[in-house]
Structure formats: structure tokens, C-alpha cells
Amino acid sequence: VKINANIGTSPHDISLEKEQAKLAAALEYGADAVMDLSTGGYWVEIRTALLGQCPAPFGTDTIYQVMTEATSLDDVKADDLLDMVHHHAKQGVDFVTVHCGVTRAALPLLAKRVTGVVSRGGAFLTAWMRRYGQENPLYEHYDRLLEIAREYDVTLSLGDGLRPGCLADATDKAQLHELKVLGELTRRAWAKGVQIIVEGPGHLPLNAIQKNVRLQQKHCSGAPFYVLGPLVTDVASGYDHIAGAIGGALAATLGAAFLCYV
């Protein structure tokens, strides 16, 4: 089992020195990979500096930069999402999160959710699809993503844009619809020689973790499962690191390959 540590700026706290300190701490305490999830600042300069100092695999979520640089949905075209993946790959990152499994077919399945879409990337893409009446460009033009990934030897981390944000939404139709799409995309990537990680929930009750790991292994043909937690309770605000450690420990024993600390 491998551990990923997230670092990154916010619009109100932009400091290369702070990010370098976070990176050093993550590596000191044994992180196997690091993701820069910055949402503000001088992107290229910070990412270049961190890449130069990080011996571990280094990942990004490209849609964060698209979202932050745009002033509204009207500013974001399909090519912008694909071009940003190319930009990050060309800069030298090892893996990128891409929310390719959020499709128009899943939108009606969200109606009865308690907490809706809690993933930043997922929320952005659902809003984009509703605004334009078009399919998710990362799904529609997936072959272009595969070409980029193969050219730059980048692993695609297929994001769980419809992950449940509370226990009541766990393993619902929207989550499972996305998981099945990610399985299809996994096999298409393998056929093109592209490596894949499949991201997973999210908020899950303790007794649903085994089922979710088994479902991922089934639908995604055993691709490495990268889980955010899972968080096993909704009533531990401020203590997500504890709830996530409990869920992550169980998920790891059941076959999850990659844990994202929270």
C-alpha cells in the first residue's frame, strides 16, 4: 500500500516557501507520492520548483488551475480542459487526476442526493455540462487524453467526481454509474499502453468499505484503487484525519493500493 500527501496553495495563501516546507515534511514522514492541488498563485513557477525538489512521483489535478483562472463558466471551452492536461504533462508531472467518468447520463441520478456533488472537479464539470448542454470533454475526447499520457509517460488518475459526500449518499446510483464508466475507460487506456489509477470515495460507512473495494476490483479489472479516506462518519468535522485513518486502514487490508491522507 502506498500513501499520497496533498500540498498546495490557496487564493489567499500563496507562498513557495510554505509549499516547499510541506513537501519536505511529507517526504520526511514517508509519503510515497505527492500531489500539488494549488488553487492560486504563480502556478508554473511553484510547480517547477516543487518538481525539481521532489524525488517521489508528483501529481496534479489539472482542472483546479482551469477553474481558478476562469472568471466564469463562459470562459471555459472544451479545448481548455484538454490543453491544461497537456500543459501539466509537458511540464513533467508523473500523474494527473482527470474527471473523465462524470457524464451527462449521470446527471439525473444526482437529484435525490443529500449533499450533491462534493468533488471540486465533479461540481465544475456537472455545472459546465448543464451550462453548455454538451458531454464532458474529458470523456468525449478521452482518446486525446490517452495520446497525451502516452507521449509524456503520464499515469492517468481517473477521478471520482461523483464520490459521496456523506454516508447517506454512499454507493448510490450516481457513484456506481461513474465507477462503471471508469472501468470502461481503464480498459481503453490499457489497450493504448497508458497506466491507470482509479480514485474512489469518499464518505462510506465502515460496513460498506469491503463492498466498495470489491465493486471497484470487479468493474475496473483490478486496476489500482486510490481512496480518499474513506471517511467513516459525517460527525467528525475537524477530525477527518482520524476518520480517514480508520477507513483507510480497513480499505488497505481489503485491497486498496493507494491511500490519500486527509
Predicted regions mapped to residue ranges:
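Alpha/beta enzyme core
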Residues: 1-233, 239, 244-259
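Shared catalytic-loop signature of beta/alpha-barrel
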Residues: 262
